[in-house]
From Swiss-Prot:
Organism: Porphyromonas gingivalis (strain ATCC 33277 / DSM 20709 / CIP 103683 / JCM 12257 / NCTC 11834 / 2561)
Keyword tags: DNA damage, DNA recombination, DNA repair, Metal-binding, Zinc, Zinc-finger
SMART domains, per database record: TOPRIM
Cited Gene3D superfamilies: 3.30.60.80, 3.40.1360.10, 6.10.250.240, RecR Domain 1
Residue ranges covered by zinc fingers (C4-type): 60-75
Gene Ontology biological-process entries: DNA recombination; DNA repair
Summary of the function given for this chain in its UniProt record: May play a role in DNA repair. It seems to be involved in an RecBC-independent recombinational process of DNA repair. It may act with RecF and RecO.
Protein's name in the database: Recombination protein RecR
Length: 207
């Protein structure tokens, strides 16, 4: 049954809200009606924040985290451990690890994991830039903190092989996170312990 709306403008707003992940048309209707009940200035500020988000946020040229300028706040922080690099899939993983307060090093965001079924190969990820960072910066340890999935494990092994000849220590977070889980959904205590209890990657696999 096709839903009819009393206003073309309302329907237009619903159409836009419904494009968001996890938002159906009923939820989109509730959101649109909620905004209608707000003061006009509040709605303007909401809309302006979304436009600013899209137009002005960029990606850190060093680690590929989100940034308001060329370099993100983490990379620009002189108090961070510049010798340790934590490799993650996406920006949400950076936020999850930061919330544990158990890690004070730098990050490198791959932008995903190797997944042939999805057409994602090594060349589609920020792997070359990772190798370049390890070669050009004073990195002593690379921590692999990817999802405990088949794709995550495949990517871990690929990265280990790429970095093996550099002499840098390559470690992997402990298996406190259930197999098949993604980093961002792990609770802070479990994730924090997984980082603290990390082990050398070479000890975690059989060649």
């Amino acid at each position: 049954m096709i839903q009819k709306y009393p206003s073309r403008l309302l329907e237009k707003a619903i159409d836009q809200f419904a494009t968001l992940p996890g938002v159906g048309r009923k939820t989109a209707l509730r959101l649109a009606l909620y905004l209608l009940r707000q003061p006009v200035e509040n709605t303007r500020q909401f809309a302006a924040a979304l436009v600013d988000l899209r137009e002005h946020i960029s990606y850190c040229r060093r680690c590929h985290n989100i940034s308001d300028s060329g370099v993100c706040t983490i990379c620009a922080d002189p108090t961070r451990d510049q010798s340790t690099l934590c490799v993650v899939e996406n920006i949400r993983d950076v936020m999850a690890i930061e919330n544990t307060s158990q890690y004070r090093g730098l990050y490198h965001v791959l932008g995903g994991v190797i997944s042939p079924m999805d057409g994602i190969g090594p060349g589609d990820l920020q792997i070359d830039s990772l190798v370049h960072r390890v070669a050009s910066e004073q990195i002593h340890e690379v921590i692999l903190a990817l999802s405990t999935t088949m794709e995550g494990d495949t990517t871990n092994f690929f990265l280990f092989r790429k970095l093996e000849s550099t002499g840098v220590r390559v470690s992997v977070i402990a298996r406190g996170i259930a197999i098949g889980d993604e980093i961002e959904y792990a609770d802070e205590i479990t994730l924090g312990r997984s980082i603290l209890n990390r082990t050398d990657f070479s000890d975690s696999v059989k060649f």
